[in-house]
């Protein structure tokens, strides 16, 4: 039950009545008519801009339309009052019976309350993490993993058919560097002293990989030239790193549907097919790009290259796809990979990149636009840096990696639930401070604790009621006399619950799962406020002498915990039954 959607439908119904009565012209565009929470809660429960939107096309004063609308709206049993404000805004107060219907809907649907169908089964591919398979995931990958996973869950909750995908960057030179680094650990496992040249990977995480290689191959690679072992160790090391990465992701509660290998694009004709598709559309040509101003990108050459006319699809400059020596640029396999995604029949694509890939956005969007003839939108979400603090100081070192803090470092210290929630307490493109001490504090300033405490409080009050012999099973709560909930603080909590379905749709349309975390914090604040008022106003306490009153109040508390559980489920966080 989406009360905001119901009220918007009611507003449009009243507009139709005005059209029928000759008060408004027919064929008005209703697209921009909204019903939403007012900026100032003192003005009402909801507000509509209908009169302001329709005034100009109708050739009438907005206030005149608003006053006529107010009369029609006030006749509906769900509306307690409809008041015109300013030049033509319309503020609505919802009748208590309508609020109680929302509460009953929450109890009836459980965590499906708020589940939407705006996706209508459209296929969406969400690609995230996609870290180079050269070592354990670091804290930056952690943020991308959590954001992408929560976004995928949000879209699933909103009715989309979602595929979670990881692109394995196993086709580039960095995997050769990994193989050489593993070879050094392999020699070390044979008792040799080795030095790690600049540019190799010296982290301790490769020590067991070197030992595993020794166990598998014995001394067959010792003293051999690079060409004798590079390709074998390349494959062995990549597989070992992907096992490590999969384990890292699992520790965070992230599981992918698809792992797609970049290497599979080479020697299979897939890159050639993608470039040929662009060529058939007149978007590939040979030419020399103007020297770029400032820092020169690695794919620029002062010679003729094969170029993609990305400027015809919104990019700033055309992009090289083949170098003058006939080898592919790093952009070419990315084009081929997205060509494959388009070919798999997705209705929309989402890529989650680190902020350092900001310069890649326009060219990638141009490629997908060209490959899909503008039919498949690509949204690229950038996740900003995470700054870690411990004991008030920046925290930068890792025993595992030697140079950076790993995902496992974070999960081991605070657990997956805290790590996931905190990563969503800021919009993805805003810097995030992660303080290991503060995220474990039991205070309002710690949003993880604040939300989990609300859920745990409901569980505790239900246990208390059961101990007093009061039935609080779901069937009993659904049958409770909800008319006993009439205090403005109780109705205010229901009003906040009513925002959940609208919030889900808004967050899903904008691909912004952080909105769920923000809402849960606000909802928990309203719940804690009601709980704390019970200290001064005894009739607001959830457990009363009268079992029927207790059941009604616990029905409200239970509905709150249901919505919190639904939101935490989207974020990939397990709701707490008690605080420890």
Curated annotation (Swiss-Prot):
SUPFAM superfamilies to which the protein is assigned, alphabetical? Anticodon-binding domain of a subclass of class I aminoacyl-tRNA synthetases (SSF47323), Arginyl-tRNA synthetase (ArgRS), N-terminal 'additional' domain (SSF55190), Nucleotidylyl transferase (SSF52374)
Ranges spanned by the short sequence motif 'HIGH' region, renumbered to the chain = 131-141
Keyword flag Repeat: no
Its GO biological process annotations read: arginyl-tRNA aminoacylation
Q: Does the keyword Ion transport apply?
A: no
Q: Which InterPro entries match?
A: aa-tRNA-synth_I_CS, Arg-tRNA-ligase, Arg-tRNA-synth_N, Arg-tRNA-synth_N_sf, ArgRS_core, DALR_anticod-bd, Rossmann-like_a/b/a_fold, tRNAsynth_Ia_anticodon-bd
Q: Which superkingdom?
A: Bacteria
Catalysis performed (reactions): tRNA(Arg) + L-arginine + ATP = L-arginyl-tRNA(Arg) + AMP + diphosphate
What are its GO cellular component terms? cytoplasm
Which compartments is it annotated to reside in?
Cytoplasm
Example of a GO MF term: ATP binding
Q: What is its EC number?
A: 6.1.1.19
Q: What keywords is this UniProt entry annotated with?
A: Aminoacyl-tRNA synthetase, ATP-binding, Cytoplasm, Ligase, Nucleotide-binding, Protein biosynthesis
Q: How does it assemble?
A: Monomer.
In terms of PANTHER family, this protein maps to: ARGININE--TRNA LIGASE, CYTOPLASMIC (PTHR11956:SF5), ARGINYL-TRNA SYNTHETASE (PTHR11956)
- Please give the family membership noted in the entry: Belongs to the class-I aminoacyl-tRNA synthetase family.
Q: What is this protein called?
A: Arginine--tRNA ligase
- Organism name: Roseobacter denitrificans (strain ATCC 33942 / OCh 114) (Erythrobacter sp. (strain OCh 114))
């Amino acid at each position: 039950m989406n009360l905001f959607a119901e009220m918007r439908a009611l507003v449009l119904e009243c507009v139709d009545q005005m059209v029928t009565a000759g008060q408004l012209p027919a064929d008005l565009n209703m697209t921009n008519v909204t019903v939403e929470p007012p900026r100032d809660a003192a003005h009402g429960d909801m507000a509509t801009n209908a009169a302001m939107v329709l005034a100009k096309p109708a050739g009438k004063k907005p206030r005149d339309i608003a006053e006529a609308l107010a009369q029609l709206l006030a006749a509906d049993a769900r509306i307690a009052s409809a008041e015109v404000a300013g030049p033509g805004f319309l503020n609505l107060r919802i009748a208590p019976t309508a609020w109680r219907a929302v509460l009953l809907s929450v109890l009836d649907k459980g965590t499906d309350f708020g589940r939407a169908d705006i996706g209508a089964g459209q296929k969406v591919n969400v690609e995230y993490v996609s870290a180079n398979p050269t070592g354990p995931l670091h804290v930056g990958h952690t943020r991308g993993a959590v954001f992408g996973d929560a976004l995928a869950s949000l879209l699933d909750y909103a009715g989309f058919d979602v595929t979670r995908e990881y692109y394995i960057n196993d086709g580039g030179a960095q995997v050769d560097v990994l193989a050489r680094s593993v070879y050094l650990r392999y020699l070390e496992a044979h008792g040799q002293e080795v030095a790690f040249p600049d540019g190799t990977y010296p982290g301790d995480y490769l020590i067991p990989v070197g030992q595993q290689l020794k166990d598998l191959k014995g001394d067959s690679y010792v003293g051999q030239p690079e060409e004798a072992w590079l390709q074998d160790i390349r494959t062995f090391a990549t597989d070992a790193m992907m096992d490590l990465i999969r384990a890292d992701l699992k520790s965070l509660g992230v599981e992918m549907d698809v792992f797609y290998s970049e290497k599979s694009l080479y020697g299979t004709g897939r890159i050639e097919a993608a470039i040929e598709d662009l060529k058939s559309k007149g978007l590939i040509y040979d030419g020399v790009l103007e020297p770029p101003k400032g820092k020169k990108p690695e794919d620029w050459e002062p010679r003729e290259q094969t170029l993609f006319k990305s400027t015809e699809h919104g990019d700033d400059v055309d992009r090289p796809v083949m170098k003058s020596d006939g080898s592919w640029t790093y952009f070419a396999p990315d084009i081929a990979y997205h060509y494959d995604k388009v070919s798999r029949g997705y209705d929309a694509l989402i890529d989650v990149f680190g902020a350092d890939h900001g310069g890649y956005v326009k060219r990638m969007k141009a490629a997908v636009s060209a490959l899909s003839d503008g039919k498949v939108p690509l949204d690229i979400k950038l996740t900003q840096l995470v700054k870690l603090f411990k004991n008030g100081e920046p925290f930068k070192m890792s025993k595992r990696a030697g140079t950076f803090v790993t995902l496992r470092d974070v999960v081991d210290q605070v657990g997956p639930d805290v790590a996931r929630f905190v990563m969503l307490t800021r919009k993805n493109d805003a810097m995030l401070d992660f303080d290991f001490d503060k995220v474990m504090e039991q205070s309002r300033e710690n949003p993880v604790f604040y939300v989990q405490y609300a859920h745990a409080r409901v569980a505790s009050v239900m246990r208390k009621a059961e101990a007093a012999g009061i039935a609080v099973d779901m069937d009993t709560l659904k049958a409770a006399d909800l008319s006993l909930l009439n205090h403005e603080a109780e109705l205010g909590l229901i009003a906040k619950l009513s925002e959940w379905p609208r919030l889900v749709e808004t967050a899903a349309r904008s691909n912004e799962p952080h909105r769920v975390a923000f809402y849960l914090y606000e909802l928990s604040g309203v719940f804690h406020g009601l709980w704390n008022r019970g200290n001064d106003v005894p009739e607001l306490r959830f457990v009363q002498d009268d079992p029927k009153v207790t059941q009604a109040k616990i029905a409200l508390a239970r509905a709150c915990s249901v919505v919190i559980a639904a939101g935490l489920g989207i974020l990939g966080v397990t709701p707490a039954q008690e605080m420890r």
